[in-house]
Amino acid sequence: MRLLKKIWVLVILFGAFSAVAQDVQYSQFYASPLYLNPALAGTSDQHRVVGNFRDQWPAIPGSYISYSISYDVNISEAHSGLGFTVQRDQAGSGALSTTTVGGVYAYEIKLNRKLAFRPAIGLAYGNRAVDMTRLKFGDQLLTGNDISVQSNLINDRVGYMDISAGGILYGNEFWFGYSIYHINRPNNSLLGDENYIDARHNIHTGYRLP
């Protein structure tokens, strides 16, 4: 009963924090390990290549399509893990797209014979772009109007650096991880104003049953 009360307290505390949705979410969390937590880089004994594809509302024209690929490897002699990620998100028939390329590094620290901690950091470069030739506006369809597109865009693309970090505490039977993405809250506005990406927090845990 006391354990159940503690669990409810944790749920309430986590629920007290506001969440802002701006990143793509894959339904199979552990099938995209580096997107869940950079500290998962190198947790496999072998070379690992992961691919993900997500098509939201495929029956509707101009659906949201996201795909990513990652590679990570364990460097046992250095107690480290390295990983690389590429992700692309397309919205509105590909008119608006975001591409991110990055790398992560994780290091394993043995706390004692049963516990270990893996801190990690990630650095990525993002590019957000809009293709105005894929967009059509009502005034373009009027007879006699110029078909050229007029917009308030300062640039048709913008680049930014993105920083992430995370950590995993684990033993033989359990693990607990936390990660934060967009630590530096990069500005990805195409209008020349301020449009900062909010930080994304992930908490994940598990227990291995005998």
Predicted features by range, described:
Residues 22-210:
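Subset of outer-membrane beta-barrel
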Residues 1-25, 31:
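Bacterial Sec-dependent N-terminal signal peptides
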